[in-house]
Amino acid sequence: MRSTIVATFAAGLVVASLVAAHGIVTDIEIDGEWYTSSLVFEDPYKIPIPERISWSFFGSGNSPVADFTTRDIVCNGNASAAALVAEVDAGAEITFYWDTWPESHKGPVMTYLANCGSDCRTVDPGALFYFKIDHAGLEDGEWISDQIIANNLSYTITIPEDIAPGNYLIRHELLALHLASDELGAQFYPMCANLRISGSGIINPTGVQFPGAYKMDDPGILVNIYNDIDTYTIPGPPPYNSDSEFSDDDFESVAEISAASVSVFNSSDFIASTLTKSYSALASVYTKPSTSDFKLKKSFSLSSVSVPDGSSDNFDCNVNG
């Protein structure tokens, strides 16, 4: 009887310690400016409740989202919209600081952006489309979660320089895989914050929706990390890469191009070549879907071309979608 009580007590201590060790983001540094994140164990008891840039999930505490097929996977359980918005320039760095993270909770980190339209404070986060801007997992036998612990419980990402300005929801999460060998054993720790991104970019990458982006049998979600694995597939789409405009063959335009002016030499072959190479200059919006083919979604035709005599002149053309 005594041994049963001792065993039960020990198991309770293990569970309690694991619950206490679950982490949340407590601070966010945005281009050198600090913001306190929503504090699930403090803010609900303050009068008035502090306004934050991060969405609150007071009812969930620091517990993980186990069932990623529910709306809880978007911004955590019973998430409520944040009242404030942080201003940030495209190309700036954002650092997320966690309060704690147990060494046993090995796994990847992932960060997404979603364009909210007019206002992130009134949007339904489950209706948005999220494009990944950063992720890290297992590299050279070391999990990124261990690096986060070693780096003062912090992780830094960079806002892509070429994305279009606007209101964005940033979604940041750690995924713990210590129980991921069982279905729904993977533990997600997502959070969201409101951003207003400034810049001169024109890119609107395609995205995925939550729930829906992750599947039960994804190799990065249903996985036994104790099998001495050498490689690990991070869940979700690949991160958007600003540098891959001409190196990757997977851009697809959704822009409607009405007119353009291109400087060319007096050569019909050069005109055709320049129109092809100058496609990026003509389009106002790009998206980057998960396809291996470079496609122009909007077909276009030259309605008029006038090239005066001379070695180098301008011509005007109308590009019709």
UniProtKB/Swiss-Prot annotation:
Q: Tell me its cofactors.
A: Cu(2+)
Where, by residue number, does Cu(2+) bind? Answer: H22, H105, Y189
Residue ranges crossing the lipid bilayer per the database entry = none
Give the range the annotation lists for the signal sequence: 1-21
What reaction does this enzyme carry out catalytically? [(1->4)-beta-D-glucosyl]n+m + reduced acceptor + O2 = 4-dehydro-beta-D-glucosyl-[(1->4)-beta-D-glucosyl]n-1 + [(1->4)-beta-D-glucosyl]m + acceptor + H2O
Question: How has the protein been applied in practice?
Answer: Lignocellulose is the most abundant polymeric composite on Earth and is a recalcitrant but promising renewable substrate for industrial biotechnology applications. Together with cellobiose dehydrogenases (CDHs) an enzymatic system capable of oxidative cellulose cleavage is formed, which increases the efficiency of cellulases and put LPMOs at focus of biofuel research.
Q: Where does O2 bind?
A: H178, Q187
Record's GO cellular component terms = extracellular region
Q: How is the cofactor bound?
A: Binds 1 copper ion per subunit.
Residues annotated as glycosylated: N78, N152, N266
Query: What is the enzyme's class at the highest EC level?
Result: oxidoreductase
Subcellular location(s): the record lists:
Secreted
Pfam hit, one:
AA9
Cell division as UniProt keyword: no
Q: What pairs make up the disulfide bonds?
A: C75-C192, C116-C120
Q: Which family does it belong to?
A: Belongs to the polysaccharide monooxygenase AA9 family.
Q: Which named protein is this?
A: AA9 family lytic polysaccharide monooxygenase D
